[in-house]
Amino acid sequence: MAKFAHADVLDNGPNYIKTNCNKMALISAYTFGDSYATVNAALLAEAAMASGDFTLATAGNDRTLTTAAGKSDASANASGGSASNHIAFVDTVASKVLWVTEETSGQAVTAGNPVNFPSLVYKSVQPVAA
């Protein structure tokens, strides 16, 4: 299962997600580097996001970005999904996929049913000497 962070996130850190993400999406499949259009085509459910839905913190020497718990879509857009589900954080204004991570429940989604998103953590770690 693929995970992804956009080059802008890698260059600017987790605050870039906090500042620019305006949608969290449950998608039915993801392959590393999938385009914004491909991610939207795999959309099962979505929730609007704002900078206040993210919390930046320090964990030891690392920086973490935690998403708010309790985000939901009252009515799933489509049916589908399985063990290959992912959660994508996108910037709809700039048409960018900012961050993609695995959705681990593996539950199928039925169109029209509610979908609850878990709280997730993006971690930016200190470099280590080789």
Regions found by a protein language model. Give the residues of each.
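Small cysteine-rich, disulfide-bonded extracellular modules of the LU/uPAR three-finger superfamily
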Residues: 1-85, 92-130
